[in-house]
Amino acid sequence: MTTPADVHEVRDPELPGRLLSVERDALLPLLRARGEGDFASPVAACPGWTVRDVLAHCSAALSRVVESRYDKDVFSPASNQRDIDERAGWTITEILDELDRGMAEAGPVIAKAGGPLDGVALGEWVHAGDVRVALGEPGAYAGAGLPFALALLAQVTSARGHLPLHADLDDADEPVRLGDVSGERPPARFIGDGPTLVRLYAGRPVDEVAYELAGADAAELNIFG
């Protein structure tokens, strides 16, 4: 019998699109209500980038997925910076419109890709959390998208053969199993809440947050480098 902890062993192709859709409904109204000056706020998780830069990166990445535009160094730091620079003359509204379209249209493309693009959807959701932190908004790495993000994180880490981890989450009814399921390495163990687990896997700071991690160092969990 398949349990919720085992679901990630079989890829759900619709999961990335669902995560993007939920986040689109939550994030875009928040951003459109913000003043122009807020988009110049620095984003601590992305040194050297402002909120505007992060959103330009996110909108560009989704447009590349929708349009199947993959340069040789696509999604590399250099490619990401070029995408941001190309949008330097855009208005905030234009960037948000591109992001809106991308979050609405990328899901089916990611689904058909078979798995390699699943991490793009997860990265978009993490960056939405980065933006919330920069703007002082509540709900960073949490909210309605968290259950979908955790399921996608399990799916992505399993596909990549990442180190195995068993997570007992304060805010979930069932444990979450992440990473390699071969059994070759004993799973690490995490006890804490979902947003903290996401922060660890995304390489975001978890200062002053109570959690337990045994069998692995926090740095080993980072899937974004």
Where are these regions (language model features)?
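N-terminal capping/interface segment
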Residues: M1-G37
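Structured surface interface patches that mediate subunit assembly and partner/cofactor docking
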Residues: T2-L15, S41, Y70-V74, K112-G225
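Short, helix-capping/interhelical loops that line the mouth of catalytic, cofactor-
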Residues: T2-L15, S59-A111
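Hydrophobic packing residues in well-ordered alpha-helices of helical domains and bundles
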Residues: P16, L20, I92, L96-L99, ...
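Structural signal for well-ordered, non-membrane alpha-helices
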Residues: R24, L28, R32, L62-V66, ...
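Helix-loop segments that flank and shape redox-cofactor active sites
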Residues: L28-W49, P108-G115
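Short, structural beta-strand-to-alpha-helix junction motif
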Residues: T50-V51, T91, D193
